A protein has these predicted regions:
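Structured beta-strand/loop patches that form or line metal/cofactor-binding pockets in enzymes
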Residues: 1-32, 36-37
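Metal- or metallocofactor-binding catalytic centers and their adjacent structured scaffolds
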Residues: 26-99
Length: 99
């Protein structure tokens, strides 16, 4: 199984825009994660796009490896934007594993 795409979806709500992430695989299994970060939706979506470039074509079941590779590759480690994006993608990968 390989990751084929990662898409973001923004749901506009009062005072907070919710950001959801959906990871797609070549076997038709998808996973969903949530990455809301108040007033930083565009930065968050940009961070998810960078993660998409890394994960496309990779095995979605190697969750911990991908988490550490992405975290260590980031210049600003531990920041709110990166950690929210990474958390959402990680949730989606665990969702895929569970399915």
């Amino acid at each position: 199984m390989k990751v084929t795409d990662i898409k973001t979806f923004t749901v506009d709500c009062f005072r907070t825009n919710w950001v959801f992430v959906k990871v797609y695989t070549d076997e038709g299994i998808t996973g969903v994660g949530e990455a809301t970060l108040e007033y930083k939706e565009k930065a968050l979506i940009g961070a998810v796009e960078h993660i998409r470039e890394y994960l496309t074509g990779k095995n979605p079941l190697q969750i911990e490896k991908h988490f550490h590779d992405i975290y260590r590759d980031a210049y600003w480690r531990g920041g709110a934007v990166l950690m929210s994006a990474l958390s959402a993608v990680e949730m989606a990968l665990w969702d895929i594993l569970g399915k």
